């Protein structure tokens, strides 16, 4: 551009509309040769068209601090919607408008075309489940969660039409950070997960827009504010005991190592009692609220069928959680290494139901019942553990909506992201009973996506050899694994089931525990 004074006095030429192909060649703009003109003055920054969502946050990366201070503060967006057009053509049997990554997942899922056509909404539900931006592992997990950019809600599908527009509401809720876990010997796909709550709102009556906006406002008010790290640390200081656990406990022996913490056995110096100690590095915990939740629940809820919380200490950023030690290990070792008879299974189910009846009576849902979270004493005692995922329910919120637990043990209403109540624990107990029969939960050998589809659509899973089970046991399983939540038994009801009257004494579990330990030694 020339610095000629004459050009400086000329007004700028009107802007010329150019097609994108002119710039795509990479050469000089051919039109510029015909106009010895200065470019149009730049539009003031405040008036630039910009993306409503991205530009609010991009200033921290591109703009200077000075500019930030000059601009009025703008709060992050709330209640914004990300619309995804996903349809299902009943004639061709194909989804339309599906995100590319979901399409790739579906292609390798082993969900047949017939299954997709039979229940396309269930397919979308399980694809949403695999949205890795919302799937979280619990604390002490061995592998850090992967993050991916996905829409945060599952499109709702209207199968009556060939294509529908689905509105996905992205909420800034408590469950969005990477999440806390327990050490489990199973493959990654059997580990506990935690995902954001996504429930489609009940549509407002036609023409009554105020009802919908009022409901949203009410939901916002009910949502509890997210605690800052400092608030969490302050809360922890009010919960824990003062002192140094290294002085109160001795003979530390490591029995487990996770990505963000370690589990030891140790001995109480004063009492000579053997305990289990979780040492958790809080700096590595992106979901610290779950730790507070677990401590508070275990502190308040004392029951013979729940692993006893003993104490907790905070030393710098290290949290020490001291718990009762059960030397028999987890029920997983027994179900994978030995064969249980029906009377032994009945004994374990009875003890777990006693724990669940107590929890549910205290308005607590465990949400992660599986053999990994049932610990055994050498004398055969059976106790539930791992309350990082438990949820309290109130009269105002009698149903939960967060997808949480472990995929193969999940109730259908959780997989399909419906509101749920305490009976999700009963379904998981039924799956655990099948574990005790077959050594693993149903669908474990299926592709995980297809397994979720089958859980969502099949109802009660089929047993490998149902004829080998007594009618009374099959009836107990059917009561636990009833697809209709209203017909599914409660913990209180199932404690009266005739199957539990077959239970052997708990001491009958001791030979199984010893056999499992021996088998595991041989496998090393």
Curated annotation (Swiss-Prot):
Q: Which residues carry this modification: N-acetylserine?
A: 2
Span list, region Disordered: 1-81, 142-190, 204-228
Q: Where is this region: Autoregulatory region?
A: 69-137
Q: In this chain, where does the modification N6-acetyllysine occur? A: 62, 128
Q: What class of enzyme is it?
A: transferase
Residues flagged as site, Cleavage: 212-213
The cross-references to Gene3D superfamilies, in alphabetical order and at most eight, read: CRIB domain (3.90.810.10), Phosphorylase Kinase, domain 1 (3.30.200.20), Transferase(Phosphotransferase) domain 1 (1.10.510.10)
List, in alphabetical order, the Gene Ontology terms for molecular function in this entry: ATP binding; identical protein binding; protein kinase activity; protein kinase binding; protein serine kinase activity; protein serine/threonine kinase activity; protein tyrosine kinase activator activity; small GTPase binding
Instruction: Tell me which residues this entry annotates as catalytic.
Output: 368
Composition bias (Acidic residues) maps to 169-178
Q: Which InterPro entries match?
A: CRIB_dom, CRIB_dom_sf, Kinase-like_dom_sf, PAK3-like, PAK_BD, Prot_kinase_dom, Protein_kinase_ATP_BS, Ser/Thr_kinase_AS
- The residues the record assigns to binding ATP are 255-263, 278
Activity regulation field: Activated by binding small G proteins. Binding of GTP-bound CDC42 or RAC1 to the autoregulatory region releases monomers from the autoinhibited dimer, enables phosphorylation of Thr-402 and allows the kinase domain to adopt an active structure. Following caspase cleavage, autophosphorylated PAK-2p34 is constitutively active.
Q: Which reaction does it catalyse?
A: L-seryl-[protein] + ATP = O-phospho-L-seryl-[protein] + ADP + H(+); L-threonyl-[protein] + ATP = O-phospho-L-threonyl-[protein] + ADP + H(+)
Polar residues composition bias: residue spans: 155-167
Q: Biological process GO annotation list?
A: adherens junction assembly; bicellular tight junction assembly; cardiac muscle hypertrophy; cell migration; cellular response to starvation; cellular response to transforming growth factor beta stimulus; dendritic spine development; intracellular signal transduction
Chain intervals for the UniProt region annotation (Linker): 88-248
**What is the E.C. number?**
2.7.11.1
> Where is the sequence biased in composition, kind Basic and acidic residues?
67-81
**Tree of life domain:** Eukaryota
Residues recorded as bearing Phosphotyrosine in the entry: 139
Q: Which residues form the Protein kinase domain?
A: 249-500
Q: Give an example GO cellular component term for this record.
A: cytosol
PANTHER family from the UniProt entry: NON-SPECIFIC SERINE_THREONINE PROTEIN KINASE, SERINE/THREONINE-PROTEIN KINASE SAMKA-RELATED-RELATED
> What is the similarity comment for this entry?
Belongs to the protein kinase superfamily. STE Ser/Thr protein kinase family. STE20 subfamily.
> What's this protein's name?
Serine/threonine-protein kinase PAK 2
- State the organism of origin: Rattus norvegicus (Rat)
């Amino acid at each position: 551009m020339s610095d000629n004074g004459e050009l400086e006095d000329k007004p700028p030429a009107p802007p010329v509309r150019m097609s994108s192909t002119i710039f795509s060649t990479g050469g000089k703009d051919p039109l510029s040769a015909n106009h010895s003109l200065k470019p149009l003055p730049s539009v003031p920054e405040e008036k630039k068209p910009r993306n409503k969502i991205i530009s609010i946050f991009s200033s921290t990366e591109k703009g200077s601090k000075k500019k930030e201070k000059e601009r009025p503060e703008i709060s992050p967006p709330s209640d914004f919607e990300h619309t995804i057009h996903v349809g299902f053509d009943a004639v061709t049997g194909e989804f339309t408008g599906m995100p590319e990554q979901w399409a790739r997942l579906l292609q390798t899922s082993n969900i047949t075309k017939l299954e997709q056509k039979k229940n396309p909404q269930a397919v979308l539900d399980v694809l949403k489940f695999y949205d890795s931006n919302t799937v979280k592992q619990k604390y002490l997990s061995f592998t850090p969660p992967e993050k991916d950019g996905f829409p945060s809600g599952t499109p709702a599908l209207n199968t009556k039409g060939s294509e529908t527009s689905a509105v996905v509401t992205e909420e800034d809720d408590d469950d969005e950070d990477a999440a806390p876990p327990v050490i489990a010997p199973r493959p990654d796909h059997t580990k506990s997960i935690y995902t954001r709550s996504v429930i489609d709102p009940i549509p407002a009556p036609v023409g009554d827009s105020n009802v919908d906006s009022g409901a949203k406002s009410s939901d916002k008010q009910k949502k509890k504010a997210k605690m800052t790290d400092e608030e969490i640390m302050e809360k922890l200081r009010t919960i824990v005991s003062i002192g140094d656990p290294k002085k109160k406990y001795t003979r530390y022996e490591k029995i487990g190592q996770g990505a963000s913490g370690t589990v030891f056995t140790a001995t109480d110096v004063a009492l000579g009692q053997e305990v289990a100690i979780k040492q958790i590095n809080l700096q590595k915990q992106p979901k610290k609220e779950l730790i507070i939740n677990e401590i508070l629940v275990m502190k308040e809820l004392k029951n013979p069928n729940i692993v006893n919380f003993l104490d907790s200490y905070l030393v710098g950023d290290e949290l020490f959680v001291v718990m009762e030690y059960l030397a028999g290990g987890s029920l997983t070792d027994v179900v994978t290494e030995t064969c249980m008879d029906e009377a032994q299974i009945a004994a374990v189910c009875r003890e777990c139901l006693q724990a669940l009846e107590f929890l549910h009576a205290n308005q607590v849902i465990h949400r992660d019942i599986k053999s990994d979270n049932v610990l055994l004493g050498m004398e055969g005692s059976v106790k539930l553990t791992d309350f990082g995922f438990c949820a309290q329910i109130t009269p105002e919120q009698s149903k939960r909506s967060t997808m949480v637990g472990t995929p193969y043990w999940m109730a259908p209403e959780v997989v399909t992201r419906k509101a749920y109540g305490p009976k999700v624990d009963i379904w998981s107990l039924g799956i655990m009973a099948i574990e005790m029969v077959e050594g693993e939960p149903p669908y474990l050998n299926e592709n995980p996506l297809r397994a979720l589809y089958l859980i969502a659509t099949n109802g009660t899973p089929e047993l490998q050899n149902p004829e080998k089970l007594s009618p009374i046991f099959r009836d107990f399983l059917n009561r636990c694994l009833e697809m209709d939540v209203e017909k599914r038994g409660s913990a209180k009801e199932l404690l009266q089931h005739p199957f539990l009257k077959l239970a052997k004494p708990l001491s009958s579990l001791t030979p199984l525990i010893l056999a499992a330990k021996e088998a595991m030694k041989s496998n090393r």
